[in-house]
Amino acid sequence: MKVLSLIFVIFSVLVLFASAKDPVCDQPKAVRRCFAAFPKFYFNSSSGQCEGFIYGGCGGNENNFNTLEECNAKCA
């Protein structure tokens, strides 16, 4: 019975760590009015998906990815 309990605890911890999301993904989309227009992607925590936006080239935060694949790998 102890072995079964230990296996359950280890499995639960592994699932918890596997589902932990990077805090970068909870940052809001940061759109500032600058003079550039770069197509980028961010993770929308409300919809649970990566979405495109136009990055103005200044300011912002780390929830800013060059490709949809990069965003999905980090956050989805």
From Swiss-Prot:
Cleavable signal peptide: 1-20
Domain of life the protein comes from: Eukaryota
Disulfide bonds: 25-75, 34-58, 50-71
UniProt keyword terms in alphabetical order: Blood coagulation cascade inhibiting toxin, Disulfide bond, Hemostasis impairing toxin, Protease inhibitor, Secreted, Serine protease inhibitor, Signal, Toxin
Pfam families, sorted: Kunitz_BPTI (PF00014)
Cell compartments where the protein resides: Secreted
Major localization listed first in the record, in broad terms: secreted
Record domain BPTI/Kunitz inhibitor: where: 25-75
Tissue: Expressed in salivary glands.
Gene Ontology molecular function, alphabetical: serine-type endopeptidase inhibitor activity; toxin activity
Record-level GO cellular component terms: extracellular space
Function of the protein: Potent anticoagulant protein that inhibits the hydrolytic activities of all serine proteases tested (trypsin, thrombin, elastase, and chymotrypsin), with the highest efficacy on thrombin.
Protein name: Tabkunin 5
Species this protein is from: Tabanus yao
